[in-house]
């Protein structure tokens, strides 16, 4: 029996192993990017809630009235970037808002509207993440 030529077997085995390896590696990078974005959004929502507590809720509690706070609790981009600098990578800008009608609990929502996942395997399920913090009063 004649022995077959073994040239190129290593390259073929590398191709079989490299494709799943690189897909897994980029999926891990993409999920890590999503996780740090979600953590930064939670941090930004918490900072907005603290700003509401200090600037609006404290005055309403002293005057014994219902707080009437709406809009962006951290109106400048510099204040938001100081709290969560990762959200500004790639030219993205997060939004932070409070509903116009005050109900208990007061909810502060931070979102990243133009965020998209790099890997197409996720679809659109993880695009435009948002996080919120509720303040009971």
Regions found by a protein language model. Give the residues of each.
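N-terminal leader/signal peptides at the extreme start of proteins
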Residues: 1-7
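N-terminal signal-anchor/signal peptide hydrophobic helix marking the start
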Residues: 7-20
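Aliphatic-rich helix starts adjacent to a transmembrane/signal segment
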Residues: 10, 25-55
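Short, conserved structural patches
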Residues: 38, 46-137
């Amino acid at each position: 029996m004649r022995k077959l030529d073994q040239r190129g077997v290593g390259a073929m085995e590398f191709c079989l192993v490299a494709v799943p390896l690189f897909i897994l590696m980029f999926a891990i990078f993409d999920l890590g990017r999503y996780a740090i974005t979600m953590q930064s959004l939670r941090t930004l929502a918490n900072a907005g809630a603290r700003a509401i507590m200090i600037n609006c809720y404290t005055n309403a509690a002293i005057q014994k009235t219902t707080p009437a706070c709406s809009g962006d609790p951290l109106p400048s981009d510099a204040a938001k970037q100081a709290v969560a600098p990762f959200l500004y990578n790639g030219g993205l800008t997060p939004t932070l808002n409070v509903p116009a009608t005050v109900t208990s609990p007061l909810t502060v929502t931070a979102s990243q509207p133009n965020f998209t996942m790099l890997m197409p395997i996720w679809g659109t399920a993880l695009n435009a993440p948002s996080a919120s913090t509720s303040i009971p009063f």
